[in-house]
Amino acid sequence: MAAYCQAQGLDVVLAALLGAINQQPSRQQFQQQQQQQRQPQLQQQQQQQGIQQQPQGLQHQQQQFGLTQQHGQGRRQNIVQPNPASQNNNRMMLDMLLLNQIAQSNRMNTLAFIMAN
């Protein structure tokens, strides 16, 4: 692929693609990032709805001694994190650009071949 891109004069696109590939996290890292981002969102939603997570054993002890759960409004600071979906979109755009360039050069090669014969 790299040799083909260089032969077609697509060094800039190749460099951009290689940069995107080098920055691309592994599938496991990406899933961990998504999980880490979902967890605070889930906790935030639960706090806004007045739901608090407690281990099952503690809940049972509270019921045994006649204690009730307190539902309070949780306050949480909003932390802005980069959206991994936008990074994926950028990679997809680079892939589309490269494919477009390859298709265009193939058309030009086909045209030159037809003209030569």
UniProtKB/Swiss-Prot annotation:
> Mind listing the UniProt keywords for this protein, alphabetically?
Secreted
**Known tissue expression:** Component of the acid-soluble and acid-insoluble organic matrix of calcified shell layers (at protein level).
Composition bias, Low complexity? 27-72
Q: Where is the composition biased (Polar residues)?
A: 75-87
- GO annotation, cellular component aspect: extracellular region
Segments traversing the membrane: none
Q: Where is this region: Disordered?
A: 27-88
Enumerate the subcellular locations listed in this protein's record, separating them with semicolons: Secreted
Annotated protein name in UniProt: Glutamine-rich protein
